[in-house]
Amino acid sequence: MSSNDSIMLTPLKEQDPTVAEIMRHEADRQRSSVVLIASENFTSRAVMDALGSVMSNKYSEGYPGARYYGGNKFIDQIETLCQERALAAFNLDPAKWGVNVQCLSGSPANMQVYQAIMPPHGRLMGLDLPSGGHLSHGYQTDTKKISAVSTYFESMPYRVDPNTGLIDYDMLEHDAQLFRPKILVAGTSAYCRLIDYARMRQIADSVNAYLVVDMAHISGLVSAGVIPSPFEYADVVTTTTHKSLRGPRGAMIFFRRGLRKHDKKGNPIYYDLEDKINFSVFPGHQGGPHNHTITALAVALKQCQEPAYKEYQAQVVKNAKVCEEEFKKRGYKLAADGTDSHMVLVDVKSKGVDGARAERVLELINIVTNKNTVPSDKSAFSPSGIRVGTPAMTTRGFKEQDFVRVVDYIDRALTFAANLQKELPKDANKLKDFKAKLGEGEQYPELVQLQKEVAEWASSFPLADKW
């Protein structure tokens, strides 16, 4: 074997054992952890096979039938198939909807939509981050523009009602009449209730705005029909592909075709979104698409049509409801008083800890969550909650009784965290002091025992991996 052949043909474990060892440790971590991050999931072996394939080798700037490189016969076939399966996964008529499957990730996809629809400094409204929105919907504070979206465009937030935790549609409508946005974004990252898309459509129409729905978190639930679909009301729908959808890491943009509305004289006005959005994706913001990802996405979208997939998504919602009930039994306050989707947002302040402390203690017992703002928070940088999602562990086989056990473990860990916080002196009780005292948890028998129980339990459920 030549030296070049040795480089090209030697398996990873032999050629680069350092990287292979890190990957093995990550596989072990995933296998032995209860993963509750709502934006994470475990994709299938078939999807991973497609990701690590020859489709990664090909360059293909452009779109099917209009490439800037030769040799794209089969790349065209896979991208076209992916588009067809994307429309089928959401029961969409190709005469009324198109889709771009080249987007690299969710936040860039949103930016591509904004740029396609309006010029720099155009106006958009999105749900405020502390209310459960997403950075890419134009988040900014009183003193700083955080998301680049708020730099390139003029953004104004709408918020939840502080008393109910639900989107305040009346205030949104009032503010929209004053702000006159070109785009109204209906989408969330930590809002657990259903969005009233019909009301959003009515508000958008009242100011002649486009309704852009970001269903990144819930697209799997929408595809399976376990929650209402936004497509009846939206002009554009964006989604990531790796959260509840359970595909590879990527994104899609769906756009309307055909008649949009009639003007005051009764003349038809047609959508012109397709060319604008496609141009915004390529060449506006991207070069060559990631063909291995598009291939893997095609595989995942076929899985969306399987009865087992629909059963899985129904179980995701059932498991989230169990989490709601169990947290309430233990006296926790939940944002919006519960969930209709795949996650609950738990306010842990009443336990005497904040989101960051809760996240760290839970990680030490192999329960992986993320700190998150709750509507009552004054700052997105000091969150009082944790976000608990059910898609990942439902993929591995968790049912209702398993999530009862999950909530019990969380409650025990947070009780420990609160007691540890109380032991800190008043002049040294900040997060860094808490983490310093906590260390890796090895000096606390209670944490060691919890970690052992969780790791053994989680490891008993299957995980699709190559290790």
Curated annotation (Swiss-Prot):
One of its GO terms (biological process) is tetrahydrofolate interconversion. PROSITE patterns: SHMT. Its main location: cytoplasm. The keyword Transferase applies. The modification N6-(pyridoxal phosphate)lysine is found at K243. It catalyses: (6R)-5,10-methylene-5,6,7,8-tetrahydrofolate + glycine + H2O = (6S)-5,6,7,8-tetrahydrofolate + L-serine. Disulfide bonds: none annotated. One of its GO terms (cellular component) is cytoplasm. Belongs to the SHMT family. Homotetramer. HAMAP family: SHMT (MF_00051). This is Probable serine hydroxymethyltransferase, cytosolic.
